Structures are given as structure tokens and as C-alpha cells.
Amino acid sequence: MNDFHRDTWAEVDLDAIYDNVENLRRLLPDDTHIMAVVKANAYGHGDVQVARTALEAGASRLAVAFLDEALALREKGIEAPILVLGASRPADAALAAQQRIALTVFRSDWLEEASALYSGPFPIHFHLKMDTGMGRLGVKDEEETKRIVALIERHPHFVLEGLYTHFATADEVNTDYFSYQYTRFLHMLEWLPSRPPLVHCANSAASLRFPDRTFNMVRFGIAMYGLAPSPGIKPLLPYPLKEAFSLHSRLVHVKKLQPGEKVSYGATYTAQTEEWIGTIPIGYADGWLRRLQHFHVLVDGQKAPIVGRICMDQCMIRLPGPLPVGTKVTLIGRQGDEVISIDDVARHLETINYEVPCTISYRVPRIFFRHKRIMEVRNAIGRGESSA
């Protein structure tokens, strides 16, 4: 690859993302919109590349966490409707309106300030967030809800486009709290004189498990990337998800250690016999965290343990034998019959699968595959992007 100069890279299978969205499109009622969630650089997969693929596969809208992410998509040529799920500043409402970006609203005082600051000419579309039990953002009070709706109706350039909530436990096998939140949302809908054009409550877990409780839009996030919302509900999903992200490197140095020789900072690993040790150019600055010591990678189709402490830019693995420099190493993905999934990495880190691709940093170039060929290489360092 001429687009990056270190032998570490991630591969993003856009065909897998396309299939995951298309399969959801088939599962849902025909009149249900799909909002593809591409916040956090599309969970580390690549925002604009995933956005385009999701829209091609049947999504009609996009969601991000904050306004800067939405503006970045606009700058990259994305014209589809975008919703900011998080909080925005009242002073930025004009910029959002100019760029046709919808904002989440959940406070009447915020709307009052935005109303005083904005006089047009573009409409500002709002989605009213209701707190049914997540305890994060959202309105809980009927009177506050009515104040917000009245403020929107009073302003000539404010439009109430949507109403939504977020489930805290839709990814758990037990559905008691999910049912409580759903029932509460139905009750809150009665606080409005009429429903806005878009009503949405279902995240990935709810949209896959309860397609009959999605109103007329779902927010498709983690499952779009081929990851189950939780290990517990993975067997309950209506179709198999296709994991899109893999991570690779190459051996840059191979050496034989004698019994008693040490490896890495702190000299925490000691060779017990003659051992072949390989160095690969990836470390915790790339998101391959120090806690992954004692985990494993795949090399020559076999598992190879990570030995010694993971460094900022490199780590060491115990090889099955004297392999040549340049041999491919897979940290996430498949080699032969062996697979390391994102769930495997998350389990070792004692975290959720969402965190793993999000953690792989901008230093790691992304290679995007579409129709089983390289479509684009994105290197956030230096020369940026190139297309095949």
C-alpha cells in the first residue's frame, strides 16, 4: 500500500454493512424508516463510507452524537437528513438550520434562548426526546412537554419533526423494564395534541427483537456493523449479522530467545524454553490496549499469545516457529479456520463490543472493501484519502 507506510491496518467490509441494513429493511414493515447511526466515526468504521453504504441499502436518514459530526458529513457530500442525538448549543441552531440538520430538544429554556437568537430564514427541525427510564437526556414532565411543543408551534421557523425515547435494557433477555419503558412512551405520546411525522423508540436490539413496536422509524446502530447488541440476545436475533471490521498487522522483527530472557517493559515475561518472538507495529496508542496482554492474535493460521507488556506503538507475540518478517498477523478477523471476533476482544477486556472498534484510533488506516474489492483507503495521518 502506498497510502500508508506502517504495516498495520483495519479492513471494513462495506458489503457486510449493506447486507445487515438490507436484512433489517426486509424485516421491518414497509413504511418504517431506518435511521443509520454513524456517530463516533461510525463506531470506528468510517463515517462517510458507512453512511453512503447504509443509504444505498435502504436507510433514509442518519444520526450522529453532536453537531460537529453532522457538519463533517455535510462537508463530505452527504445530503440525507441527519439528526443530532446529543445536546447542542442554542447559538448553533442557525448553523444546523442552514445545513438542514435536525436537533434534539429536551428543555424549554433551551428553546426560549434559541428562539430569541434565531429569526430565520431556514426552518429548524427538532426531535423531542422523552425520558422513559434511561435517566440521561429527555423530558419526564407533561407540563414541560407541553411548554416545548407550544414554543415550537409559536416560532415561524421551528418544526417539530420527531418524537423519540431510548431503551435502557432492550438488549437484555428479560423484557420487564423494556415493556415498562414502552408503555410509558405510549402514555407520553398522549401528552401531545398530535403526533409529529416521525416517532421512534427502537434501537438495534428493539428493532430486531420487536419489529412490531417500532412506530415509523428505527435507529440502527451496533447491529449495522454486524455486532449483536449483547451476548445474551445473540441467539434471539432473527438473522445472522455479518461482522464488518477486522484488524491486521505484519511481523517486522523475529528473534529467538533463550530460557530466562525477558520481554518488554517491566520484564514481566520470561521465556521458559527456546522461543521465537515476533514484534508487530501496533500498540496502545492505536487502541490495542495494555490490558490485552495475555490475549492472542492469529499468525500462520494459529493462535499466538501476546507476551510482555503492550507498548505505545508495538507489541510482541510468541510464534509457533521461525516465521519470516512480513508474515501477516490478524488481531481481529479470520485466518484459516481460526477467528478472533470483536466479542472475543471485548470479553478479554471485560467490556462491551461497542467499545472495541471505537477504540481503534485514527493512527490505524482503514481499507474499505465493496463488492469484494478495495474501494477506498483512508489514512487520517498525512495524505488522507484515496479511492481505488
Swiss-Prot record:
Q: Where does substrate bind?
A: R136, M312
One Pfam match? Ala_racemase_C
Name this polypeptide is given: Alanine racemase
Q: What is the stated purpose of this protein? A: Catalyzes the interconversion of L-alanine and D-alanine. Also weakly active on serine.
The UniProt-reported impact of K39A is: Loss of activity
Spell out the InterPro entries in the cross-references. Answer: Ala_racemase, Ala_racemase/Decarboxylase_C, Ala_racemase_C, Ala_racemase_N, Ala_racemase_pyridoxalP-BS, PLP-binding_barrel
- Pathway as given in its UniProt record: Amino-acid biosynthesis; D-alanine biosynthesis; D-alanine from L-alanine: step 1/1
The biological process GO terms on file are: D-alanine biosynthetic process; peptidoglycan biosynthetic process
Please tell me whether the keyword Isomerase is annotated for this protein.
yes
Which positions carry N6-carboxylysine? Answer: K129
- Kindly list the cofactors needed: pyridoxal 5'-phosphate
Q: Which reaction does it catalyse?
A: L-alanine = D-alanine
Mechanisms controlling activity: Inhibited by acetate and propionate. Irreversibly inhibited by cycloserine.
Q: Which CDD domains match?
A: PLPDE_III_AR
Per UniProt, the enzyme's principal EC class comes to: isomerase
Q: What is its EC number?
A: 5.1.1.1
- Origin organism of this chain? Geobacillus stearothermophilus (Bacillus stearothermophilus)
Q: Which UniProt keywords apply?
A: Isomerase, Pyridoxal phosphate
Q: Which residues carry this modification: N6-(pyridoxal phosphate)lysine?
A: K39
Q: Which family does it belong to?
A: Belongs to the alanine racemase family.
